[in-house]
A protein has these predicted regions:
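Acidic/polar active-site rim loop that often engages polyanionic ligands
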Residues: 114-127, 149-151
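Accessory alpha-helical/coil subdomains and C-terminal extensions
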Residues: 33, 88-91, 96-100, 105-108, ...
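Short, ordered loop/turn segments at secondary-structure junctions
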Residues: 8-11, 36-41, 68-69, 91-93, ...
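Glycine-rich oxoanion-binding loops at beta->alpha junctions
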Residues: 42-96, 118, 126-139
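Solvent-exposed alpha-helices and their adjacent loops that cap or buttress functional pockets
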Residues: 4, 26, 54-58, 78-82, ...
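N-terminal phosphate-binding or glycine-rich loops at protein starts, especially the Walker A/P-loop
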Residues: 1-41
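Short glycine/serine/threonine-rich phosphate/pyrophosphate-binding segments
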Residues: 12-22, 43-44, 71-76, 91-99, ...
Length: 187
């Protein structure tokens, strides 16, 4: 069987570990694994490489690179011909491209969407990266608190939230932090 993997949208913790796990599992079953560079941009342009598990580390980012491009279904349909499965490791917006591809009648490939986002903004899905982002932010909050107490200062931290603010709320509660106020923009 021929397998494809792509990552689309922003980066988050655990992506390379997931890519490596998928690759090892698929190769253990005798399957060939291909990675599409730069997410849906690479899929649209058929930019792919054969994956060997020795070449995948579990460091930060994505070994495949990523982009915010959306799928061009007409181009992508031709480029996934011959693939039995395509793993799409996507955030909220880029998952819509995976859906569009999966719903196209010309596609015979199984499209598997795997949620990855530090914002936890995909209702009903647990996403890769959210828990690690909470842990890292909580550690950063602890350091900022120590700085504030040590210098008799007030510290402001700006944290991205994409409208739902789950990351900052969970991180603030993660270690019984001494956060006094959380100011969120009105939506």
């Amino acid at each position: 069987m021929n397998i494809g993997i792509l990552t689309a949208g922003g980066v988050c913790p655990g992506v390379n570990t997931l890519i490596r796990s998928i690759t090892l599992r698929e190769k253990s079953q005798g399957n060939r694994v291909h990675g599409f560079a730069d997410g849906f941009r690479g899929l649209n342009q058929n930019v792919k490489t054969y994956f060997d598990q020795e070449h995948i580390d579990d460091g930060p980012g994505s070994i495949l690179k990523t982009s915010y491009d959306f799928v061009n279904v007409d181009e992508a349909v031709n480029n996934i011909t011959g693939l039995d499965r395509l793993y799409c490791i996507c955030g909220n917006e880029s998952m819509k491209s995976a859906r569009d591809l999966a719903l196209d009648d010309r596609v015979d490939t199984n499209i598997i969407g795997i949620a990855k986002t530090v914002f936890n903004d995909m209702p009903g899905l647990e996403s890769l990266g959210f828990q690690t982002a909470i842990q890292e932010l909580a550690r950063y909050i602890d350091c900022a608190y120590i700085e504030a107490v040590s210098t008799n200062s007030i510290v402001f931290l700006e944290v991205p939230g994409r409208g739902n603010n789950e990351l900052v709320v969970h991180a603030g509660l993660a270690r019984n932090s001494k956060i006094t106020n959380v100011i969120t923009p009105s939506t």
